[in-house]
Amino acid sequence: MELRVGNKYRLGRKIGSGSFGDIYLGANIASGEEVAIKLECVKTKHPQLHIESKFYKMMQGGVGIPSIKWCGAEGDYNVMVMELLGPSLEDLFNFCSRKFSLKTVLLLADQMISRIEYIHSKNFIHRDVKPDNFLMGLGKKGNLVYIIDFGLAKKYRDARTHQHIPYRENKNLTGTARYASINTHLGIEQSRRDDLESLGYVLMYFNLGSLPWQGLKAATKRQKYERISEKKMSTPIEVLCKGYPSEFSTYLNFCRSLRFDDKPDYSYLRQLFRNLFHRQGFSYDYVFDWNMLKFGAARNPEDVDRERREHEREERMGQLRGSATRALPPGPPTGATANRLRSAAEPVASTPASRIQPAGNTSPRAISRVDRERKVSMRLHRGAPANVSSSDLTGRQEVSRIPASQTSVPFDHLGK
């Protein structure tokens, strides 16, 4: 018997799950377009899907934001039908033998800064910036980076007056310890600067393959998080970034120098990496390391030029749509839902705060076919689950998962 949603979509196989419900592959009955269908039992104790849909409505209009196809109730379930997305950057990192080339890191950095800037422009901070929460698009949007999972997001300023939330201390650590900012470890209320500092650690994770505070042993989780904090604070930025272009240490030093309520200079940070990209002589061909491993060679110039034009057209359309959505209502409440913690790579459950490679690493390491197939359990691109983090795919339950995503400009070398 064929299961239908909204009398328009066919329900297919299950492709993921979280504590909030299950995610299925679906298809538009008329057009055959593949979609992601999220189901949540109407009797669930802590309904999340309605809150998630509010985030999407608030973020709609930005380039690359997954479009919401349909929302409503179907039988015993709350349902949200949305655009299907591809694998996460953590999945792709594993596919590439846990090392990205400098070119790929810089291409990603540019887009990731823009995603965070967009969230901040909508008056929210993400508070869980990590590779699992960035996904690639599919098809002609396969080179567009999306940001997902607003389960820990918090409103940091009033939408109308832009009054910033007050500075506070003795806060519980919220987020993922591996990428948490030093101020977060110290129990200081998070703000825009912390999302960007976390991104700096993500970029060095992509460069190095792992961070110095990974793999630390401790008797309890609390002690482990304290050891991570101590190691992070005792590792100078210059040591962390040794062997890599100075732009990475400049980025992190800039983020750590920001005051609590400062508005970061996103353009300056993007330009740091764009200038480095130019000096390295890299090409704006949108060929990431996983493309090389998948196809064995770069695409022809006609394909590259076509993709560049598509990106620029998406950008222009997104700017027009975005300007029409600024009056949308604010997102979900930021109480218990936003404060619940998630489990992933060194996840932090509400705890009290208290290999160098030359910079010329410009192409991915070859790996054997067997290794690659083993690592590709994440289903590279086609048919990959939509808006599902790596932890969903490995069966780990998440607390208060509210995936959402937004994007702004892909690596637009003609602007800014």
Curated annotation (Swiss-Prot):
Reactions performed catalytically: L-seryl-[protein] + ATP = O-phospho-L-seryl-[protein] + ADP + H(+); L-threonyl-[protein] + ATP = O-phospho-L-threonyl-[protein] + ADP + H(+)
Covalent S-S links between cysteines: none
- Identify the SUPFAM superfamilies for this entry: Protein kinase-like (PK-like)
Q: Which PROSITE patterns match?
A: PROTEIN_KINASE_ATP, PROTEIN_KINASE_DOM, PROTEIN_KINASE_ST
Q: Which residues form the Protein kinase domain?
A: 9-277
Any GO BP annotation: negative regulation of Wnt signaling pathway
Instruction: List the active site.
Output: D128
- Spell out which residues are annotated as carrying Phosphothreonine: T362
Question: What SMART domains does the entry give?
Answer: S_TKc (SM00220)
| GO CC, alphabetical | cytoplasm; cytosol; growth cone; neuronal cell body; nucleoplasm; nucleus; ribonucleoprotein complex
Q: Which UniProt keywords apply?
A: ATP-binding, Biological rhythms, Cytoplasm, Kinase, Methylation, Nucleotide-binding, Nucleus, Phosphoprotein, Serine/threonine-protein kinase, Transferase
The entry marks the following residues as binding ATP, namely I15, G16, S17, G18, S19, F20, G21, D22, I23, K38
Q: Which residues carry this modification: Omega-N-methylarginine?
A: R382
Query: According to the UniProt record, where is the region Disordered?
Result: 301-416
* GO terms assigned for molecular function: ATP binding; protein kinase activity; protein serine kinase activity; protein serine/threonine kinase activity; RNA binding
Q: In which tissues is it expressed?
A: Expressed in all tissues examined, including brain, heart, lung, liver, pancreas, kidney, placenta and skeletal muscle. Expressed in monocytes and lymphocytes but not in granulocytes.
InterPro entries according to UniProt:
CK1_Ser-Thr_kinase, Kinase-like_dom_sf, Prot_kinase_dom, Protein_kinase_ATP_BS, Ser/Thr_kinase_AS
Does the record's keyword annotation contain Transferase? yes
EC code(s) of this entry: 2.7.11.1
Known consequence of changing R256L?
Answer: In a lung adenocarcinoma sample; somatic mutation
Basic and acidic residues bias: start-end ranges = 301-318
Which Pfam families does the entry link to? Pkinase (PF00069)
The family line of this record is: Belongs to the protein kinase superfamily. CK1 Ser/Thr protein kinase family. Casein kinase I subfamily.
What the protein does?
Casein kinases are operationally defined by their preferential utilization of acidic proteins such as caseins as substrates. Participates in Wnt signaling. Phosphorylates DVL1. Phosphorylates DVL2. Phosphorylates NEDD9/HEF1. Central component of the circadian clock. In balance with PP1, determines the circadian period length, through the regulation of the speed and rhythmicity of PER1 and PER2 phosphorylation. Controls PER1 and PER2 nuclear transport and degradation. Inhibits cytokine-induced granuloytic differentiation.
Cite the record's note on assembly. Answer: Monomer. Component of the circadian core oscillator, which includes the CRY proteins, CLOCK, or NPAS2, ARTNL/BMAL1 or ARTNL2/BMAL2, CSNK1D and/or CSNK1E, TIMELESS and the PER proteins. Interacts with PER1. Interacts with ANKRD6. Interacts with DBNDD2. Interacts with LRP5 and LRP6. Interacts with SOCS3. Interacts with SNAI1 (via zinc fingers). Interacts with DDX3X; this interaction greatly enhances CSNK1E affinity for ATP and DVL2 phosphorylation, but inhibits DDX3X ATPase/helicase activity. In the presence of RNA, the interaction is decreased.
Q: What is this protein called?
A: Casein kinase I isoform epsilon
| Naturally occurring in which organism (per UniProt) | Homo sapiens
GN (gene name):
CSNK1E
